[in-house]
Design a protein with these regions (language model features):
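Helix-rich catalytic cores of soluble enzyme domains
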Residues: 1-106, 122-136, 389
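Peripheral docking tails and interdomain loops at the edges
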Residues: 341-404
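Generic long, charged, amphipathic alpha-helical segments
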Residues: 266-267, 274-329, 339-350
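Intrinsic disorder at enzyme termini
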Residues: 113, 174-272
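Long, amphipathic alpha-helical stalk/connector segments used for oligomerization, subunit docking
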Residues: 148-168, 173, 179-182, 186
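Conserved, mostly hydrophobic/aromatic
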Residues: 63, 110, 138, 157, ...
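Short acidic/histidine-rich active-site segments
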Residues: 111-122, 148-155
Length: 404
């Protein structure tokens, strides 16, 4: 989980590793049944609430299926959960409290024997007495106030969870068998088959985060623009994966984007400013301004609330001569068809260097807009990491040119 795997992989590889250990111990003359009775499994628990519940249920089901192949039908084992590293963030870190709470709830409803809840600041600080106390209080609240310890298997019979459990079990069993067919856990790991399979899932997750299809509050969605954060706390991005799987946060690549901004701020003692220049249709200009505020806030730039103008020409003149570093055109598609080209031409006649963006994707006129001087568009399908990286490069170039 903390290296970017999905729940199916987590279960399958855990069972593959178990079978490898059992076979090794059996070859050395040890009895299998006592091993099962002393078995302890700990898994990270992520933020996909219902799927994580199903994961622990599926694990127990498949564990008993494995034990039966060794002639063990009744045994006492323990399964514990630990709140994941993958789901935690450095920016807007108090959101980690909410993630840790829902993760603990998932694990408990999945019928684990214990849950370790990390402090919300564990990923970037030595946990403070306050953060440790809050982490401990989460389990106390779930037990004493929410009565999670009073009902046995409360999710039994819930259709969605039962279906998810069945599907995860089937897929995990198929993956488990495929690894065994390759010679088992040791061979698959030594040949880096497992690492490659995890890497494929990890890259897909990171891609979805960068496209904001996998939302993470405070990271790629709803960034806290009031937050002050030191560049030293932020990641420089993911390091190349080694043969040994290394736990990491999902947010590393986006943190690196924020770090670039914070380093620039420390160098020039000024935070780059984004201006949202709105005109035309009220509903669409507000919707696109809100989207732009959220999207560009990920960068760590100072994003001004939208400014509404009577016309595209007025908006272009005023925003071109303001002290902002980035301007975003916000309006409706019909308004873009009628006025966007005028906006870009007027803007560039007053300022040839400032970053100029458009919120939306008017494909019919996009070539003409870019030829006139539009830098880029931001829209629902934009890749936040790639787009902001390009904006940062031009902003840095413009600011440093002014210093010369």
């Amino acid at each position: 989980m903390d290296s970017g795997s999905n729940q199916v992989q987590e279960i399958a590889y855990t069972l593959n590793a178990l079978v490898f250990v059992l076979e090794q111990l059996s070859d050395r003359g040890m009895d299998i049944e006592p091993i099962f009775n002393h078995l302890h499994i700990e898994l990270a628990v992520g933020s996909e609430y219902f799927i994580e519940i199903a994961k622990f249920r599926a694990l127990n089901s498949l564990l008993h299926a494995v034990s039966k192949t060794y002639g063990v039908t009744d045994f006492k084992h323990t399964v514990t959960a630990k709140t994941s590293i993958w789901s935690k963030s450095v920016t807007d870190a108090h959101t980690n409290l909410l993630r840790a709470t829902t993760e603990a709830m998932s694990a408990i409803l999945g019928n684990v024997d214990g849950v370790l809840i990390d402090a919300y600041d564990n990923e970037f600080n030595a946990p403070s007495p306050f953060s440790k106390r809050i982490a401990g209080n989460i389990s106390t609240i779930l037990k004493e106030e929410s009565y999670f310890g009073k009902v046995a298997n409360p999710v039994d019979g819930a259709y969605y969870i039962e279906e998810a459990t069945t599907k995860i079990s089937e897929k995990a069993l198929a993956l488990f068998k495929s690894i065994e067919a390759l010679g088992g856990f040791y061979n698959a790991f030594e040949n880096e088959i497992i690492q490659q399979q995890i890497a494929e899932i990890r890259q897909e997750k990171i891609k979805r985060m960068s496209q904001r299809r996998l939302p993470m509050v405070g990271v790629n969605k709803y960034p806290n623009l009031m937050e002050k954060i030191s560049a030293t706390m932020l990641s420089e991005g993911a390091k190349p994966q080694t043969k040994v799987l290394v736990p990491r946060r999902a947010s590393l690549e986006i943190e690196a984007i924020r770090k670039t901004t914070e380093v620039l701020v420390e160098e020039i003692n000024k935070r780059p400013i984004v201006e949202l220049a709105s005109f035309g249709n009220l509903t669409m200009r507000k919707a696109r301004a809100a989207f732009s505020y959220d999207f560009l806030g990920v960068s760590g730039f100072e994003v001004w609330q939208e400014k509404n103008y009577e016309s595209a020409q007025t908006a272009a003149k005023v925003s071109a001569t303001s002290n902002s570093d980035v301007v975003v055109i916000c309006s409706s598609d019909p308004d873009y068809e009628a006025s966007a080209l005028t906006f870009v031409q007027t803007f560039r006649s007053h300022n040839s260097e400032k970053v100029l963006l458009l919120a939306g994707n008017p494909v019919n006129i996009l070539d003409a807009l870019k030829a006139a001087g539009l830098d880029d568009c931001i829209h629902m399908k934009s890749d936040v990491i790639q787009t902001i990286a390009k904006i940062q490069k031009k902003v840095q170039k413009n600011i440093k040119a002014l210093e010369v």
